[in-house]
Amino acid sequence: MADDHKLCGFLCTVLSVDSPDLLQSGSSCFIFNDGSVTGFKSENGLILSLTNPISNLQSLISSKGDHDVENSGTIEDGRLETPQKRRKCVEGESSGKRKTPKSKRRVLSGSKEKTVQGRKRVKSIGMVNGSISVVQQLHALVANKCLKIICRVVKVDKGENGEERAVVLVDVYLPIELWSGWQFPKSQATAAALFKHLSCDWGLRVSILDGKSIWEEANGRIKAIWDLSDCHVFDCKLLCNAPNSPKRRLFKLHEIFKSLPSPGNHDVSYSSRVLPSTDSCVSGVWDLSDDVLISILMKLDTKDLFSIAAVCRLFRSLTSLIVPCMNLKLFPHQQAAVGWMLERERKAEVSSHPLYLSFDTEDGFSFYVNAVTGDIITEAAPMVKDFRGGMFCDEPGLGKTITALSLILKTQGTMADPPEGLPIVWCTHKSDKKCAYYEYTSDQFTSNSMSAVKRFQSPSSCRNQVSFEAFRPLLESKSLPFKQARLMDPDDQTLESKNSNFENEFETHIPASLDLKAQCRKSLGNVRKNLLPAYNGASELSEVMEAKRISNWKKCGMITGCKRKGLTDSDVESDIWMQCDSCSKWRRIIDEGVSVTGSAWFCSNNNDPAYQSCNDPEELWDKSQPIKYLQGFYTKGASGEESDNISFFTSVLREHKSSVSSTVKKALIWLAKLPLEKLSQMETVGLPGPVLGLKLDALGFQRIFRAFGLKSRVEKGVTKWFYPKFLENLVFDVPALKVALCQPLDTFRLYLSKATLIVVPTNLVNHWLTQIQKHVCSDQLRILVWADHIELSPHSLAWDYDVVITTFSRLSAEWNPRKKSPLIQVHWLRVMLDEGHTLGSSVSLTNKFQMAVSLTACNRWLLTGTPTPNTPNSQLSHIQPLLKFLHEEVYGENPKFWEAGILRPFEAEMEEGRLRLLQLLQRCMISSRKKDLQMIPPCIKKVTYLNFLPGHARSYNELVETVRRNILLADWNDPSHVESLLNSKQWKFRSITISNVRLSCCVAGHIKMTDAGHDIKETMDALLENDLDLWTEEYSFIQDSLIGGCNCKRCGEWCRLPVITPCRHLLCLDCVALDSERCTISGCGYLYEMQTPETLARPENPNPKWPVPKDLIELQPSYKQDDWNPDWQSTSSSKVSYLVDRLRKLHEGNKKSILSFNKTDNDNLEDNPPGTSEAFLGKELHGQDCGSQMVFVDKVLIFSQFLEHIHVIEQQLTTAGIKFGKMYSPMQSYNKMKALAMFQNDADCMALLMDGSGALGLDLSFVTHVFLMEPIWDKSLEEQVISRAHRMGAKRPIFVETLTMRGTIEEQMMRFLEDAEKSDRLLSGDYIEAKQETTRSRRTLHDLVESNYLSHLSFVRSDGKMEFAASQLAGLKDHQLA
């Protein structure tokens, strides 16, 4: 190779050889492509071809059937590219077109749209970069002059079938311009896919060239040559779709979660001891055992524990086990979890970028290639900074809430860390001198420290950022625009910030008059602070209005708006006025000892209790005395441009930022250009304002002018501007205004907080409060539950509380790009999302997700027992939103890296995707599992199959009959028919149908159905043409049966919608479906008129699958029908009957347990010593009644997902006299909590009836039995429900019983879930019934087999006919398989 390229890596690829005798080891070869075949060609012309050539793609796809054809695709740049538009189905011409069955037209009214069948991705080729053959990639890169290669044959092996394969060593060379910034000119993604296979093990390469034994042989053959992946790389470590890989189960997400670190339940022992410094016999702390020391340390608060932990290693280890002010001892797995979470919060580790591959050339030069984008870096290895926080994913019921509270208590009093490079402003708030905040502008954003702040800037907010480029010529002093003066640290060091509104070439300097000290609240003496009314009226308040305000504003018995009683004139002269930074109201400070020089000041700092809230009205000054100082003005004779005035003007402009339009800009420029002689007119006759046209625009700048301190008056239709009255020797500070107009207006302030923000579902607020009240020392934590009606200032939210609890709905409501929420203006110590997986439940951009991501916090935590919903084909995609909330730098901030680096490789079962995911989750997720803990009693599950009661069975069959009739008459169960429920286009209607069928297993219902008289007449006329006599009883019987139903002629079972055959037999759907070619009545055998697929194609079914009985289908009438409606009032449910019987038995057992308990107590009463008070004994026994008795009582949890089913259960439990509580939507929260308290404390209340709204957060560890009234498809939800009882604190085994109706869709689902092998085949794409699905995302597991459920629906028979129906159904299924 020429000197302009370097050897950067190598790989070995495997190819087929037609004539191995002509090929020798060491032979050179070159890559080629003749348009149809890509491979290598040796020097003697021998072709080495791919073992699965791409040219066979079309035949490979075609062999899988029409339903597998997505797009043939094209190979470009070494990748398989898929066209954007689907290939349209070709509609063949049919000479025998027939009308759409009338029974179909009632379903979707004859849709004419062509069907598009679901297609399965062809994994043998692969859509993920890296799974396509490296030979294709090499050819594309060589053709595009991205690299050069040298190839030689190093090994040839022969298989059992006589096939010969060769191993080709490929050396890859890159140009030396790489170290001068060279990048791949084309096909970067292809290059990235190729470089994942390259190796820089130069010792291995030497061994390969020397012919040393590096080949692992099995049965005399080289195993890696014959166990080949799609990439054709010898011994590929990435497992690119290896055939029949035994590691397929490793790509199940629940298997990934199981492999994550679990704290376990082992106690941590410490060997450190305190030793005396001498051999003295004096006793000391070294004589105390660890248990004694721990009991002492548990009495200390957080601050004292921090102090004593610094003494020695023993105390450091002992304090790590203690949670201050917690009223219980943590379990070992909780202690380990708290330790892990503290370690994650202490510091963010810096590590190498997971997507950059490291390479070394043969002569030692290093470079790095991005495995997704193909970007090359030759300098230092790229590094990424880990986030602080993570995902706390203990299984439900293991005490995540207590663990989270322990973390909060361990770090109580710790303030959030501000971003680097910004000064902190310290201030006092309610006697707390350690309050702080910081400010920044848009030009101070950095990629790391302020990335969180960028997120809540919407495009609309960016448009509101004002630029005053036009004012640059006005800067006579060439002053450097600076940040607001109050932004500084305690040492008076200020931030030197640039102004994003100016170009860098302007040279400016800081004027001497600006010392950049903190803004001074000066003694204003006789200054009246209500000089700037917000309305356009008189220059001062009239005495009448003043009196009115005095009469209306009263607080704590003190009248506001006038001089305070008891003040002397000397007090007035020493008066100090302070402006609140939150509400901008002015407060008068009388205490002369108060420091007036500082940063932020708030109403809460006021010594006067009548004015310590921002909600209190502003005080008024009622003396008309000369004003010697006023912000925005300077003393005559001075140069102006005072720092206080610059800050004042800047704050006013920022406050009115939304009002600054082009017209307002012109007015401000006019004001800033006024000379002194013009300003002097404001003292006397008034200065006419700028003429800007529209009155609406004038209102904007007039508000700003008044905020500056100027007064307006209309004289003869002309608005004139004046100085305030009683102004003495002061001039408007125009130079300061010029500087202020050049300040950036997009300033944000964040208040540093010691608080933790906890966001929970609405139904878990009371759970958190209960846990805090029960397990945390009283008054230890300052708690705020932020409800919808509460309005708080940001600084109060940040500094007044240790824990702020709010809901996801509140979080969503707070998102407003045009207005900053108080939540966004706080820099939280920690943000926790309980049940945080709900952020990833939607792929769309929701308000709550945007708000959660926009929150600024040092530490971010997700608490959930179910990180992803149970959606096997798309569940991994739900993790990326969680990573974005956590601000994970690689995969959370860059969706492209997530998709190409983890999601697509993982779904393609490539090892690199699994390893990256595992590496990511092992770093930021922890999960304890119940099976690893020994303190929890077992959970015993069983499924109980029940039979219908006769009335309920008839209701169920009526709905099933309607569904099956639709499917059968749509070209005889053909899923290609666009009006069939099995068709992929009908997925929404199919889901509704399945939900109704599920509900009908629990609740009786009805379909209001009327015949279409015209259609039935057509049917009867057709029968008359087939020799039916109009005046016979047979004619009347058939007509009446089609209208009202009849018994099946073959099996005798009642059918509401019978099928009439051309031979005039009335059959049920089961009997007619036994044979599609002839009548199934014994002795009849009438042959139907069959129509073949070749003549059957039409818009309703462009791709027929099989022949159908044309005359039978067209003979059937259609029926007008309404939706299926549940009727719970009249339901006789066998499920509830079974439940009542079980509850009665448990209730009898409870009575015996309580009687036995009371008898034992009475025996103990006789053993009490003489003289014991009977009243005391009675009180003691009564106290035990609610506690000790509960240990012996069976409590039952009843769960249903359907409100109608809950009503049936509620009705029949009440009738049976069983006392129960209820928690279900839409009950009010108060009633739910009342019912829960009754269930917990009343021994006679043995059952709690609830729906999914109570499946989260409840601690029902005293419950012994759980009844699931219907199968729960989402297994994560089922686990949540069971975990209400099966959790820490449970003392007895938990019995879980799932009630399932026999022979229904419920039984189908239970059988499917119990068959793990079938589930695996379905999820891998091999299950035949799932082939018709489209590419839409599957929401739950049962979505994958919806069509299978409907196609196997069967009627429910009663009593003796069950066996007959079972045999009929078996025969029907065998016929369909045949």
From Swiss-Prot:
- Signal peptide positions are none
Q: Where is the composition biased (Basic residues)?
A: 97-107
Q: Give the Pfam families listed for this entry.
A: F-box, Helicase_C, SNF2-rel_dom, zf-CW
Show the GO MF annotations.
Answer: ATP binding; helicase activity; hydrolase activity; zinc ion binding
Q: Please report the stretch or stretches of sequence annotated as the Helicase ATP-binding domain.
A: 720-885
Where in this chain does the entry annotate a coiled-coil region? none
Residue ranges of the motif DEAH box = 834-837
Q: Which domain of life is it from?
A: Eukaryota
**Any idea which positions bind ATP?**
733-740
Name the InterPro entries for this protein.
F-box-like_dom_sf, F-box_dom, Helicase_ATP-bd, Helicase_C-like, P-loop_NTPase, SNF2-like_sf, SNF2/RAD54-like_C, SNF2_N
Which family does the record assign?
Belongs to the helicase family.
- Quote the protein name from its UniProt record: F-box protein At3g54460
Q: In which organism is this protein found?
A: Arabidopsis thaliana (Mouse-ear cress)
